[in-house]
């Protein structure tokens, strides 16, 4: 009992230290936690999540090549046009566009490019930017749990398919439930006071001359290579979805399966990157300097540290976890969503949270190919690994706060009372609630 107390203390200390350090520090602190748990507290090291890391590396490599060719800028340009064309619907369009960009790219960092546009359009419509900004940021986080090319979705589909839930079926649950949750949250937020000219902080900044008029962005002509790189990437994503469905046991168009799902995604994405470099005539040596590549490799280190730390602790206490979880979650299914929500707050990654906890939950609930009665609980609760918005230290949250010159998107005096908490909790709660309705019908 005393040993377990110290082990939990080390686990929590490592997670809080990582959150405090931020960036690569999240992964570094995870490695420190593994070192202490194994060398000083007698635990056996868990499994290093090589599969998730390799998928992130491959997808990020392809997106980075597309960014270098101008394809990512072209994609954002399309999104900007949609937002500017329908400014009055900014509260619905901002999360919709952010969601779609994340679904396609497999990373929520694409929302960075939308933040200045959202602020400008909101200002022009006398709407507090904090509403569409918070909705967009949160939507980009929950969309990770529905993106065909995100590491979290690929991991989940890989571990759930042997249990009878194929890739396409899972997407049929996760995409509509998460998107509808984003739209319902936007509708609910519409009942709050959204008038910008009623915000005293904004009026104070306006009077002090701290708010500059929106800058007109110079329209740049999109090159043919930029458009081509985007279409190559989209083609790769579609090919992955079709191939992953074709090799599933329920469809079985491809038999025998020579290239498994994880290997297929890595090889497809690297092939996409190769085609972009060849046909879009970009310098492959410069790809590593792109912002997407740097943030993606940072994500790899974070997943390495925190997922390894989580698996080290969980794998050494699997019997106790099975004993308590088997009856608690079976009797109170929503507790899994709560546990995943709390874990992702600290692990700071949808993929790392899934990798650290889901295998143990499957074992604890006794789910197998012959016993799938509790499978819907895991599928329905998956969206709750998106609680990266709770601590206001995530890059997209900080970016939204920094770029909102109206001052309506605030950090909060007591850490948790920031602009993203209520929309985030609503989106995740509604996603899970809808999941519990849809998952039993589809599976």
UniProtKB/Swiss-Prot annotation:
GO terms for molecular function: C4-dicarboxylate transmembrane transporter activity. Belongs to the DcuA/DcuB transporter (TC 2.A.13.1) family. Responsible for the transport of C4-dicarboxylates. The chain crosses the membrane at residues 21-41, 46-66, 99-119, 142-162, 171-191, 228-248, 264-284, 295-315, 327-347, 375-395, 419-439. Pfam families: DcuA_DcuB. The keyword Cell inner membrane applies. The gene is dcuA. InterPro entries: Anaer_Dcu_memb_transpt (IPR004668). Keywords: Cell inner membrane, Cell membrane, Membrane, Transmembrane, Transmembrane helix, Transport. Coiled coil: none annotated. It is found in: Cell inner membrane. GO terms for cellular component: plasma membrane. It is a multi-pass membrane protein. This is C4-dicarboxylate transporter DcuA.
């Amino acid at each position: 009992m005393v040993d377990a107390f110290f082990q939990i203390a080390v686990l929590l200390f490592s997670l809080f230290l990582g959150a405090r350090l931020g960036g690569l520090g999240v992964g570094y602190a995870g490695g420190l936690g593994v070192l202490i748990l194994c060398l000083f507290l007698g635990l056996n090291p868990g499994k290093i999540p090589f599969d998730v890391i390799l998928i992130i590396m491959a997808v990020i490599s392809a997106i980075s090549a597309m960014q270098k060719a101008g394809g990512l800028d072209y994609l954002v340009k399309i999104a900007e046009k949609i937002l500017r064309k329908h400014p009055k619907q900014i509260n619905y369009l901002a999360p919709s566009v952010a969601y779609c960009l994340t679904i396609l790219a497999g990373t929520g960092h694409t929302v960075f490019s939308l933040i200045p546009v959202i602020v400008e359009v909101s200002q022009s419509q006398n709407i507090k930017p904090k509403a569409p900004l918070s909705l967009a940021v949160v939507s980009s986080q929950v969309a990770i749990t529905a993106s065909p090319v995100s590491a979290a979705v690929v991991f989940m589909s890989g571990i759930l398919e042997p249990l009878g839930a194929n890739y396409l079926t899972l997407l049929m649950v996760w995409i509509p439930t998460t998107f509808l949750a984003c739209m319902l949250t936007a509708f609910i937020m519409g009942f709050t006071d959204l008038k910008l000219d009623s915000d005293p902080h904004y009026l104070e900044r306006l009077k002090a001359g701290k708010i500059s008029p929106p800058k007109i962005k110079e329209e740049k002509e999109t090159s043919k290579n930029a458009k081509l790189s985007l279409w190559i990437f989209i083609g790769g994503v579609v090919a992955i979805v079709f191939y992953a469905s074709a090799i599933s046991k329920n469809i079985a168009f491809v038999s025998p399966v020579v290239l498994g799902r994880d290997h297929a995604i890595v090889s497809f994405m690297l092939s996409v990157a190769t085609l972009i470099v060849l046909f879009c005539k970009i310098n492959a040596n410069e790809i590593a300097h792109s912002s997407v590549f740097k943030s993606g490799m940072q994500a790899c280190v974070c997943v390495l540290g925190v997922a390894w730390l989580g698996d080290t602790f969980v794998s050494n206490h699997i019997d106790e976890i099975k004993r308590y979880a088997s009856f608690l979650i079976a009797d109170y299914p929503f507790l899994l969503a709560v546990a995943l929500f709390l874990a992702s707050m600290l692990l700071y990654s949808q993929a790392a949270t899934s990798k650290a906890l889901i295998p143990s939950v499957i074992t604890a609930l006794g789910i197998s190919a012959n016993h799938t009665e509790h499978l819907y609980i895991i599928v329905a609760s998956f969206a709750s690994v998106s609680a990266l918005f709770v601590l206001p230290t995530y890059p997209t949250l900080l970016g939204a706060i920094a770029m909102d010159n109206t001052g309506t998107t605030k950090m909060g005096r007591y850490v948790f009372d920031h602009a993203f908490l209520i929309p985030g909790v609503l989106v995740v709660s509604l996603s899970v609630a809808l999941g519990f309705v849809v998952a039993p019908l589809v599976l």
